[in-house]
């Protein structure tokens, strides 16, 4: 009797699964009817934000204004790919392609950069364009090839055109192609369908013991017409349904890699790309983080050959390499921050060694102080204006002069240019009518932590760092102990005016004397140096209704001439209002919130947890008051 009940239960499960598969196949047929012969959706009702799938981006060629050897790079999310170098020509042809993963709430903005490669020292970016891959999802392309203007990174002048195509493979087609490739592994007689024996071998390859014990049940459920074999469509429906309900694939049947069962989309994409035979076009070389790194050429061929990861993100990167990689919040792609290699070697020698810091204690601090003051005066001289064009050239693709309030000839000294104002509206303020939403205080590289403990674990390595030490002796630190901490690091190329992150009243300004160490991550990540608690700084306390008190700490750094505030004690300020500016040099602002006063945006916390700085602009959302939310739930 027990065996009978077992058989009935098994038949019942099989019947339910078969019924679900039939409904699933009807839904798939409906979706397939909306595709053309190329597998593209003709009428897309899905929104870009909800779409997940694969985009095949092909860089066909370009038309430039002079002859050279050219290469192109595509940056998308945390990956960058590059083409081969063309022959010397004005019209390079690459025909290079790469499959990009589109995820819900993932990156969608791709940046294509074109470099000239005739220089021995470093390839030079000539032009770039940005395109939203999701535009190809919601719009039917008018032709297989589109032309985009290439813009000069500094002037936004058109310097050429690039020709590319982007084909979006909808999820149903991806499932079917995936099933076809999966089926081919064990289709021993190559008849395009699976017998029970072949199906059993496939289930074994998936590495799921539970599924292997139910292979007969799964086979009968998949074989909807009862002809004793499973077709491509039947297998696709089974795999799609099971991956949604009870995943049966634990290991990739191609490479054997263990798959994350919780990440169904990436598991399918991983296996799809493992099976990929390509289209015959040249596949772009990957393994890079930024377009600048990808453009270096021969170094990366060597690094790939030796299977070494030359570039990476995180804490060790910032403290030990001649570059800093940050993630752009807007485009969700990685970008490289330029630092002169000689400066990097000097900073490492000083800040990453006990000997260097001992020199600091024996008078080098005073030398840095005098050097910074001297350099500040020099940058305020009329002669210093001659340095502006060279500065713009060095940071060619990182300063947008179209945003600047005045034309270049307006600036009579380098410092006037350094503290340049922006045009009204250049930095929109998030949720302007909501005082419970805090915003970013500067154009900067940002690190955010819900607690001081997190900040010292992931980023600040100075042994003596504390909130009490940061605020100085003349500010009562009790309200801020165990509070949230946000670090806004401004690089030389950034807009150097800082703004109010919250609306409230400025209670007081307190000057704290100190040294002028660099605020570069090379120093911040040093266990021998206490940058934030030893540098010259000014503390502003802002009293708010939504966040309680907020400490706004403006910290000077090497080469910073002065910290200037444009507001006064007792003045009411709105978030986004200009609060002050730094003269020439790198500099940092730190905001400290009271404990449990703010819920910092998750993407900022996730990046900071990876020791990865986020590139943000003034006015971007920083977080939301938790106290306002708590009050609203009590009412």
Curated annotation (Swiss-Prot):
Major localization class: membrane
Positions marked as site (Cleavage (non-hydrolytic)): 586-587
Covalent S-S links between cysteines: none
GO CC, any one term: plant-type vacuole membrane
Modified residues (Pyruvic acid (Ser)): 587
Domain (EF-hand) ranges: 174-209, 210-245
Record GO biological process: phosphatidylethanolamine biosynthetic process; protein autoprocessing
Enzyme Commission number(s) of this protein: 4.1.1.65
Reactions catalysed: a 1,2-diacyl-sn-glycero-3-phospho-L-serine + H(+) = a 1,2-diacyl-sn-glycero-3-phosphoethanolamine + CO2
Protein's membrane topology: Peripheral membrane protein
Cofactor binding notes: Binds 1 pyruvoyl group covalently per subunit.
Subcellular location: Vacuole membrane
PROSITE patterns: C2 (PS50004), EF_HAND_1 (PS00018), EF_HAND_2 (PS50222)
Active site residues according to the UniProt entry: 443, 499, 587
Alphabetical keyword list: Calcium, Decarboxylase, Lipid biosynthesis, Lipid metabolism, Lyase, Membrane, Metal-binding, Phospholipid biosynthesis, Phospholipid metabolism, Pyruvate, Repeat, Vacuole, Zymogen
Tissues expressing the protein: Highly expressed in flowers and at lower levels in leaves.
Lineage top rank: taxon: Eukaryota
Family in the record: Belongs to the phosphatidylserine decarboxylase family. PSD-B subfamily. Eukaryotic type II sub-subfamily.
Role this protein plays: Catalyzes the formation of phosphatidylethanolamine (PtdEtn) from phosphatidylserine (PtdSer). Plays a central role in phospholipid metabolism and in the interorganelle trafficking of phosphatidylserine. Contributes only to a minor proportion of PtdEtn production.
Subunit structure: Heterodimer of a large membrane-associated beta subunit and a small pyruvoyl-containing alpha subunit.
Record comment regarding domains: The C2 domains have an essential, but non-catalytic function. They may facilitate interactions with other proteins and are required for lipid transport function.
UniProt protein name: Phosphatidylserine decarboxylase proenzyme 2
């Amino acid at each position: 009797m027990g065996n009978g009940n077992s058989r009935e239960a098994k038949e019942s499960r099989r019947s339910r699964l078969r019924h679900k598969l039939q409904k699933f196949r009807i839904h798939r047929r409906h979706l397939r009817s909306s595709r053309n012969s190329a597998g593209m959706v003709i009428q897309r009702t899905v929104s870009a934000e909800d779409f997940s799938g694969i985009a095949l981006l092909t860089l066909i060629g370009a038309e430039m204004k002079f002859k050279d050897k050219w290469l192109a790079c595509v940056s998308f999310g945390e990956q960058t790919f590059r083409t081969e170098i063309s022959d010397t020509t004005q019209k390079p042809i690459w025909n290079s392609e790469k499959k990009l993963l589109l995820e819900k709430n993932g990156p969608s903005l791709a940046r294509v950069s074109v470099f000239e490669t005739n220089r021995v020292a470093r390839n030079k970016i000539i032009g770039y364009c940005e395109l939203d891959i999701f535009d190809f999802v919601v719009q039917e392309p008018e032709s297989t090839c589109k032309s985009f203007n290439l813009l000069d990174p500094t002037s936004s002048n058109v310097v050429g055109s690039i020709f590319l195509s982007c084909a979006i493979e909808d999820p149903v087609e991806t499932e079917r192609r995936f099933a076809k490739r999966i089926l081919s592994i064990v289709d021993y007689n190559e008849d395009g369908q699976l017998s029970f024996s072949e199906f059993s071998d496939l289930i074994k390859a998936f590495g799921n013991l539970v599924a292997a014990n139910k292979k007969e049940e799964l086979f009968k459920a998949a074989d909807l017409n009862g002809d004793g074999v499973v077709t491509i469509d039947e297998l696709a429906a089974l795999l799609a349904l099971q991956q949604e309900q009870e995943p049966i694939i634990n290991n990739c049947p191609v490479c054997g890699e263990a798959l994350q069962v919780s990440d169904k989309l990436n598991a399918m994409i991983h296996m799809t790309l493992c099976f990929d035979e390509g289209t015959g076009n040249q596949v772009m070389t990957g393994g890079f983080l930024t377009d600048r790194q990808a453009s270096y050429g021969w170094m990366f061929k060597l690094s790939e050959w030796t299977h070494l990861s030359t570039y990476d993100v995180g804490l060790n990167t910032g403290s030990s390499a001649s570059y800093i990689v940050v993630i752009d919040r807007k485009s969700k792609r990685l970008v490289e921050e330029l630092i002169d290699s000689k400066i990097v070697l000097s900073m490492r020698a000083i800040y990453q060694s006990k000997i260097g810091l001992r020199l600091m204690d024996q008078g080098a601090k005073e030398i840095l102080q005098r050097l910074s003051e001297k350099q500040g005066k020099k940058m305020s001289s009329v002669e210093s204006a001659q340095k502006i064009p060279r500065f713009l050239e060095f940071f060619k693709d990182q300063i947008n002069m179209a945003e600047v309030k005045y034309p270049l000839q307006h600036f009579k000294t380098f410092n006037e240019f350094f503290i340049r104002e922006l045009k009204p509206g250049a930095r929109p303020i998030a949720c302007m009518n909501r005082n419970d939403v805090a915003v970013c205080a500067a154009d900067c590289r940002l690190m955010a932590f819900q607690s001081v403990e997190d900040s010292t674990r992931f980023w600040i390595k100075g042994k003596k760092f504390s909130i009490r030490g940061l605020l100085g002796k003349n500010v009562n630190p009790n309200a801020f102990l165990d509070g949230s901490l946000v670090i806004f690091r401004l690089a030389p190329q950034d807009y150097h005016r800082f703004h109010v992150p919250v609306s409230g009243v400025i209670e007081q300004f307190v000057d704290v004397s100190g040294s002028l160490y660099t605020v570069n991550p090379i120093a911040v990540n040093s266990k021998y140096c206490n940058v934030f608690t030893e540098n010259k700084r000014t503390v502003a306390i802002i009293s708010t209704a939504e966040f309680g008190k907020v400490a706004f700490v403006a910290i000077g750094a090497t080469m910073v001439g002065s910290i200037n505030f444009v507001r006064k004690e007792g003045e009411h300020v709105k978030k986004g209002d200009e609060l002050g500016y730094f003269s020439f040099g790198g500099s940092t602002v730190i905001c400290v919130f009271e404990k449990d006063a703010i819920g910092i945006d998750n993407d900022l916390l996730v990046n900071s947890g990876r020791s990865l700085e986020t590139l943000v602009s003034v006015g971007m959302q920083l977080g939301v008051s938790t106290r306002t939310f708590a009050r609203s739930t009590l009412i």
